[in-house]
Amino acid sequence: MATPTVAGALNEQNASRFVVAGALAPALYDIRASRLRALPGLVEVHADPVRFRAAADPRARGLHLSCGAALFNLRLSSAQVGYEPVVRLLPDRGHPTLLASVRLAGPRRSHPEERLLYATSLRPLPGRQPYGDQRPPLPVLQELQEAVRLEGATLHLLPRSGGPQTAAIATSGDGPSAWLRAGQALQSLLLHGAVRAVSVSFLYEVSRVPRALEALQPGEVPQVAVDLARTGL
């Protein structure tokens, strides 16, 4: 049972929630090159150089995207154990494998939407091929755009006639911190989509979707290409 102190929040049972949350984040290239370290009142997300396959991801961009997705799950887990998560990206330049930290900053209650998203995060999500062939309704797409915006990214809807809605997640600028933000936005999109009966397939290789470049604003960089399909009526 967790004690009233923040430092005591990460008992064995609660720490296991963070491990599960990180493990269920999406990854391509069959990479699971991250590891979580639980400290008093803090969870750190590290790159694991032993498991990282540089040949498949030479810039470690996919690694950062996947770790960003794990980071979003960790934030949900923090709310479930009753603490406000405070995230720092790339908190220590002297330790380049330390990609992010989540500090448990004080007691709080999780919101119904967070509890629903957390429950959804514990189920495997489709990651490559969408099921369903209908474009989601515009109000739902707008809700998904808002979910991505709250993570510091933009979801651009691309022109398409029929079938799923093609879109791209973009960030202002590029580099490790932008990749981590895009990963959090991707996981938010996956979970909010699942709650709204929308499947989300994704590719980190945005170059395969040339139309993504046409939708960008000055200074934006496309990070993830997605297809959004309605799965139920």
Where are these regions (language model features)?
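Acidic, surface-exposed loops and disordered segments
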Residues: M1-L233
